[in-house]
Amino acid sequence: AHADLRQAYEGFDYSHASIMYNASKIKEVERIAMVGIRDYSEQEANRIAASNGRIVAFADRVIKRRSYAGESWKQMCEDIVKSLSGNVYVSFDIDALDPSLCPHTGTPVPGGLAFEQVFFLIEALISSGKKIIGFDLCEVAPGVKDDWDSIVGVRALYRLANLMAVSQKKLK
């Protein structure tokens, strides 16, 4: 949901709100592509604009508008995949999903991606010949009264692990 491109958050240089800012400072990171962004500051938007294409954002509202205008998710996935290098690290922030799938995440935002929509994108990435070299899942917060967020998170991890193995030709 968030760009996470803040230089610091509440006095912390290394926080959930600054992780992509810190990743952008690593010279070996060729490109950062964010999908489903729907909450970001003017400073973060300026940072994306000033990155000369090194940081690209596929905002949720733009994805939705393209869909409403008749463009398929498959076509949009092709655009997203084209923006990536051959080796891809997937950082899956659970709040990219529709909040009904992760209601206990720290800062839910209306809108978001469907679970299968995310994995259709990752499968398109693999079909293009790109390789997943690693992944993480962040900002999963289990509820006090139910395990819904945990179940969604575990299923995401399971799919990510299997798809990474497929991308590395260790599974079919």
Mark where each language-model region is.
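Glycine-rich phosphate/diphosphate-binding loop of Rossmann-like nucleotide-binding domains
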Residues: R38-E42, N46-A50
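Short amphipathic alpha-helical segments
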Residues: Y9-E10, N46, L101-H104
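Active-site histidine-anchored catalytic micro-motif
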Residues: A1-M34, K131-I132, K145
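Catalytic cores of soluble, metal-dependent hydrolases
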Residues: Y40, N52, V56-K172
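Short, conserved catalytic or adaptor-binding loops enriched in Gly and charged residues
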Residues: A23, R47-R54
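Cofactor-binding loop segments of dinucleotide-utilizing enzymes, especially the Rossmann-like FAD-
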Residues: A1, I37, V140
